[in-house]
Amino acid sequence: MSSRVVVSGPTSWNRIVQVDHLPEPVPHMQFALGDHETVGGTSAGKALGLAALGRPVELFTVIGSDPDGDRLRAILAGVAGLELDLVDGVRTERHLNLMTEAGERVSIYLSTPDDRPSPADRRLEAAMTDAAVIVLDLSERSRRLIPTARAAGRPIWTDLHDYDGTSEYHQPFLDAADVVFMNADRIGEPMPFLRRVVGNGARLAVCTLGADGAIAVSSDGATVVEHRVDAVPVDVIDANGAGDAFMSGVLHAMLDGADVDAALEAGARHAASVLVTRHLHPSLDAILG
């Protein structure tokens, strides 16, 4: 088995618009505080984070044959330590993200790629068999390859993002995962849910709480333990990618042998490094400015 992590899921080209508050659902005018374009996508964020930490990582993602896709390919190809396996999705996924200084976000999907089965799926299937960890982010490709990932016998990590506890789309990811990450945006009180996830077979379930850090529940098969980690205080420039960086930091630390508490602290430190850049990860600063 290699030390390489396989990441499957979205990459996007994003326009970020900073606002002092998220718009109300009524007709009105609102002025932006600023805007910029950058790399997006939860899987790109995780892969960038792992590469920056020195972890061998291969990103399997879908990017369109359009100008935004050309930009994404050129940028990601310039990131040291990041191996890419790209599928032409005709259209590149594009988002318009409205962001507040508090990290609140509304994501408007401007376009989505063609993510139908393709011969390239076989490359991802082959890579899974020798991966230290398989990260399956929410996407059609990841979802249809869940049975293959489970058959590979390698640990599966997933990120449910703002899961509400009932979404049918998320359920196969939840059922397959050994390690589950999510945020608290829509779950209500997260601790009972995390305990339920671990009770159903996951060995670790983590919920990020923004400025309040994160909580987690772990199990070694006999003992269930609750964990908490504080956020590392920084002056926040942009919260995009912080959750991906947190998960990357935890994953890298655990593969290096850290226990859960030490890994959560490593995740918090890595997340803090992303909060002080306007890009998905500080490794993009030198490329995008």
Where are these regions (language model features)?
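Hydrophobic residues at beta-strand termini and immediately following loops
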Residues: 60, 108, 227-230
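Conserved phosphate-binding/catalytic region of the ribokinase-like
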Residues: 1, 31, 194-289
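Short, basic and Ser/Thr-rich N-terminal targeting/leader segments
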Residues: 53, 90-93
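Glycine-rich phosphate/adenosyl-contacting loop at the front of the ribokinase-like
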Residues: 1-60
